Amino acid sequence: MKIAILSTDPSLYSTRKLLEAGEQRGHEVYVIDYLRCYMKITSMKTEVIYMGKSLKGFDAIIPRIGASKTFYGTAVVRQFEMMGVFTANPSLAISRSRDKLHCLQLLAREGIELPVTSFAHFTKDINSLINTVGGAPLVIKLLEGSQGIGVVLAETYQVAKSVIEAFSGLNANFLVQEFIEEAGGADVRCFVVGDRVIAAIKRQGTEGEFRSNLHQGGTAKKIKLTPQERSIAMRSAKAIGLKVAGVDLLRSDHGPVVMEVNSSPGLEGIETATGVDVSGKIIEFLEKNLGKGPLGDRL
């Protein structure tokens, strides 16, 4: 196969591992900076142009789109889709996953358990907004945040009120969410490829830190999922339309609840903690869907 990894930085662990996995299986793999691509859109011919040359003959792409570059990145993915190129994650699914509110709405529609969440534009009645999620302590999240940035734990009503007023004053869109205290600053990352959960880790925040993101200094260890956790992870990825996804769960007193569905989950933390060749599993997924196995299988 001829595969393009859409990434702005070829030195990133995830990008390097995907490149190595593809090449080890005999495929022709390129790292393409999607921000340097431009698109030719006509009724006669659709093209993606990179460094002055039309990108032709690709069988598949693996999008690794940065959160702050979602609009342009998904436009490039969509252009490849129009050219008939298979994508590990569809452009629409990536867009859904990046819109935290839309993502939660889609999950709720499928009956998937979530923390009680509230979203509002008119914030004069802050007391009612806070009470909607059960009062303080509660979590306030910027819709545009990622990797734990823009997430605040408000432990008292007064702190919650102050943060909401500050975000409102900045015209920022934010969610107010129930705080799952019993999770103890830990979450579960389930890595979904195709229709399977191939690996899972428990991420624990540093002492005094409720955010468990590895980017915030958290630690990770391999865990075994319950059948319920495995099912909810697969259902969540399917609800958003993702084929490669990191589904983040919290273990609450009433069962697992979904916090987020990530369309470009990092590979380093989960591969290091579990020993699972996640990169190779993603390449195998492309092979399965395109009917083109490793080069050795075709010689």
Curated annotation (Swiss-Prot):
One family name in Pfam for this protein: Rimk_N
Entry note: cofactor: Binds 2 magnesium or manganese ions per subunit.
Keywords per UniProt: ATP-binding, Ligase, Magnesium, Manganese, Metal-binding, Nucleotide-binding, Protein biosynthesis
MF terms in GO: ATP binding; metal ion binding; ribosomal S6-glutamic acid ligase activity
Binding site for Mg(2+) 2: E260, N262
GO BP annotations listed: protein modification process; SOS response; translation
UniProt-annotated binding residues for Mn(2+) 2: E260, N262
Enzyme class: ligase
Residues where Mg(2+) 1 binds: D248, E260
Binding site for ATP: K141, E178, F179, D187, R211, S212, N213
Domain of life the protein comes from: Bacteria
Residues binding Mn(2+) 1, per UniProt: D248, E260
One GO term describing the cellular component: cytoplasm
Key word Transferase present: no
Domain spans labelled ATP-grasp: 104-287
EC number: 6.3.2.-
Needed cofactors: Mg(2+); Mn(2+)
Family under the similarity heading: Belongs to the RimK family.
Protein name: Probable alpha-L-glutamate ligase
Organism for this UniProt entry: Trichodesmium erythraeum (strain IMS101)
